[in-house]
Regions:
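Catalytic-loop motifs flanking and including active-site residues across diverse enzymes
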Residues: 19-23, 167, 191
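Glycine-/charge-enriched secondary-structure boundary and capping motifs
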Residues: 57, 64-71, 75, 80-105, ...
């Protein structure tokens, strides 16, 4: 049995519908990355909102519910239970009300057919290929990157409900065939955080190039590519001898070989012939721990 979750209240501040789509997608891609199968999975919801007596809150509940419905229909994964926690707000000593943002926690539960085929997210060895599966867009509304910059703008990530289930099933197939050494879904802070976590968790370095990443939505900016939080994306480590089979597995879907693992304990990121990041894993891990704590 495998259990996975998805939640992002930052999205709920701006777009309750796409927040719901995003957290369902996050729960399912976490389930897939861990070795689960969405064909044998189910969903549970937990609605956490302010007072539904306020029209804007009730509207967000309706939009989030619609997002849950659309996602469940698209993925073919049913909701089997759920709960709500409403009226989450408080009043300060000046009489000002402070509601929580629209928040939806999605839990996915499924079955792992063969636990021996499960992989973890840490890199496994030097001289492997790194693949990014899924399409990147300039979707940064509610993102960790814009929060760091103090900006309240941008588009909350949506979900391509036609393509997303195909990507999930293709990744399941690749994992089931033993083509993947390590797998990490892309969520908060996007590719930048995912590749860093995979590298410093194992003490194995990586070199990636943002130039080759499938990108749609205007002029590519390296910071947007690196920190976009577009949904339905995976970063996978693959043995060179399995590269061809892995690529054929994703025929007709967006993917790119974006780099490789290296024996040096550092992360290098290039874009259009220029090195934009060259940092030791030790420093990345220290900064990550500082943020996590």
């Amino acid at each position: 049995v495998i259990v996975a979750c998805g939640i992002n209240p930052s999205y709920g501040k701006y777009d309750a519908y796409n927040m719901a789509l995003s957290v369902v997608d996050e729960a399912l891609r976490n389930l897939v990355a861990g070795g689960g199968d969405i064909r044998h999975a189910a969903l549970l919801d937990n609605f956490c909102f302010a007072s539904p007596d306020r029209p804007e809150v009730l509207g967000d509940i309706v939009l989030a519910s619609r997002g849950c419905y659309d996602a469940a229909k698209a993925y073919g994964v049913p909701f089997i239970s759920g709960k709500d926690s409403l009226n989450n707000e408080w009043t300060d000593d000046k009489g000002n009300r402070h509601p929580i943002p629209a928040t939806l926690l999605i839990s996915a539960i499924g079955v792992v057919e063969d636990a021996r085929r499960c992989v973890t997210m840490d890199l496994k060895r030097p001289v492997s290929d790194l693949y990014l599966v899924g399409l990147t867009r300039p979707e940064l509304g509610g993102s960790e990157y814009l929060k760091l910059l103090g900006l309240k703008t941008g588009v909350v990530p949506g979900v391509d409900l036609r393509t997303a289930p195909r990507i999930m099933k293709a990744m399941q197939r690749a994992l089931r065939r033993g083509l993947v050494l390590a797998c990490h879904d892309l969520s908060e802070a996007g590719l930048g955080l995912a590749v860093a976590e995979m590298a410093f968790s194992a003490g194995i370095g990586a070199v990636i190039d943002l130039t080759f990443i499938p990108y749609r939505g205007g002029i590519p900016r390296p910071d947007f590519i690196l920190f976009s939080e577009s949904n339905t994306r995976f970063l996978a480590e693959v043995k060179p001898e399995n590269a061809r089979a892995f690529e054929q597995n994703f025929t007709g879907l967006p993917w790119a070989k974006i780099g490789r693992t290296i024996s040096l304990t550092k992360l290098v990121i290039n874009f259009r012939g220029k090195k934009i990041v060259d940092l030791p894993l030790r420093r990345l891990r220290q900064r990550w721990l500082r943020k996590a704590v």
